[in-house]
């Protein structure tokens, strides 16, 4: 089966439902409602996980932990085309994998409380990446994201900046008068 693990924009829901069996990144009630509506039109029953921003980092997607219970309640009552399977989170980046443990534990505890409150099973916890997946599994992860472990490090992306013809000549670059700016690669 195919899993969508990245951010999903509401205008891309139909396309995502055509391609993926499981969506790990449902980060708002509005998105869940949109998935339910489009799934109903398409005659589908998508499996989803709610993405929770356990760390509170502004750079991370996901709903606030305090919004999860209300979202689950609404999905169970008002979104019959959705199969809610669990929760997903991403821990803050750290060189020390143990730093991720409290975030993974908090997500597991949240899942356990939701199962008890709503008398439902939420068998999936999607958490942990190449640098911290062992800790995630110890804390209950059922799905991990292992890009670097499987495919290696990403290539370094070089930064480019536009330069004027004068700067280009001073920097040893040939001047360029084509369609687009002259750029200098910064290592």
Please name every model-derived segment.
Residues 137, 141-187:
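C-terminal helical cap(s) of enzyme catalytic domains, especially alpha/beta-barrels
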Residues 1-131, 137-139, 151:
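Conserved alpha/beta-domain cores
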